[in-house]
Structure formats: structure tokens, C-alpha cells
């Protein structure tokens, strides 16, 4: 009887310790970029972790509420055609990242103003939650001054 109990306990322990598969970080970032370019604010916010961090220059936003309001909601309507060029990426069972360069069209605030183009470097880091969903945990953008689009 003791052997059967130990065998069952061992089986349950092994079943609960399944090894996680690495994320498809390209698919995660494409989902984020597609939602951003389609102005799907709620979808973008839904991809953020509760403890997400956003850094850009000397700006730092902490947590889903602040990042949602001060980065996503305040900038999503002023940008379009976000594109990335990945230079480095990596994944394991709980963390995935991509880093590289980006370009984005900057829409004018007034109709008579010219369109701009923004370029810079990015890092997006995703973490797997306890519910097995991947969420954007860290975003860092370092951009050059916006140039008039030719």
C-alpha cells in the first residue's frame, strides 16, 4: 500500500512539473504591433502585465494603470505604421525578449502641420504569468528627435 501511495504521489509531482515551452516572441511582438497600428487600445492594454515598466529617456512609468494611461492612451492615436527591425532576441520557459530598432509615423497635431517620422531603439520583454499567459513586462524606447517626413 505504501508503495502505491508513493508511486501515485511521484506521478502527481512529475505531472505538475511539466517543462514550459519557450514563447514565440516574434508572434507576441507582432500581436502587440498589429494592435498598436490598428489603434486597438484595449487589446494593447490587455497585453500588459500588472507590474509592467516603461522607460523612455528620463521618463519612467510603473504598473499597468500608469503605463496604460501615460504611454498607451496618450500616444497611440498620434502614431501609425510602427515597424521594428529585430537585432537580438531570446526566449526560455518564462521570459522572452526582442530588441532592435523601430520607426513610426508621427501624425501632426494640426492639419496644417507636416507628418513626422520617429526612429530609435527598443527592447520589449515578456514574462509568462502564473496563469500561463504571456504579458509585456518591460518596454524601453530610446528615440531620436522626430524628423519631418519627406
Predicted regions, residues:
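Short, low-complexity N-terminal intrinsically disordered segments enriched in polar/charged residues
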Residues: 4, 16-50, 148-150
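Hydrophobic/aromatic beta-strand elements that line small-molecule binding cavities or substrate pockets
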Residues: 32, 67-71, 84-89, 102-103, ...
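Hydrophobic h-region of N-terminal signal peptides that target proteins for export
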Residues: 9-16
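Short beta-strand edge/turn micro-motifs at domain boundaries
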Residues: 119-147
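Sec-dependent signal peptide recognition
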Residues: 1-7
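A short gly/proline-enriched turn/hairpin at secondary-structure junctions
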Residues: 47, 51-62, 74-77
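Hydrophobic pocket/interface hotspot
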Residues: 32, 44, 52, 63, ...
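Surface-exposed, charged secondary-structure patches
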Residues: 72-113
Amino acid at each position: 500500500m505504501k508503495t502505491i501511495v508513493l508511486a501515485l504521489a511521484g506521478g502527481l509531482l512529475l505531472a505538475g512539473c511539466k517543462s514550459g515551452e519557450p514563447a514565440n516572441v516574434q508572434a507576441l511582438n507582432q500581436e502587440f504591433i498589429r494592435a498598436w497600428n490598428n489603434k486597438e487600445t484595449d487589446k494593447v492594454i490587455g497585453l500588459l502585465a500588472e507590474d509592467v515598466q516603461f522607460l523612455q529617456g528620463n521618463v519612467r512609468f510603473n504598473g499597468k494603470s500608469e503605463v496604460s494611461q501615460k504611454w498607451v492612451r496618450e500616444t497611440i492615436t498620434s502614431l501609425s505604421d510602427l515597424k521594428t527591425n529585430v537585432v537580438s532576441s531570446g526566449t526560455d520557459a518564462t521570459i522572452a525578449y526582442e530588441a532592435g530598432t523601430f520607426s513610426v509615423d508621427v501624425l501632426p497635431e494640426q492639419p496644417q502641420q507636416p507628418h513626422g517620422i520617429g526612429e530609435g531603439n527598443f527592447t520589449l520583454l515578456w514574462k509568462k504569468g502564473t496563469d500561463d499567459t504571456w504579458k509585456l513586462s518591460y518596454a524601453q524606447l530610446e528615440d531620436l528627435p522626430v524628423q519631418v517626413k519627406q
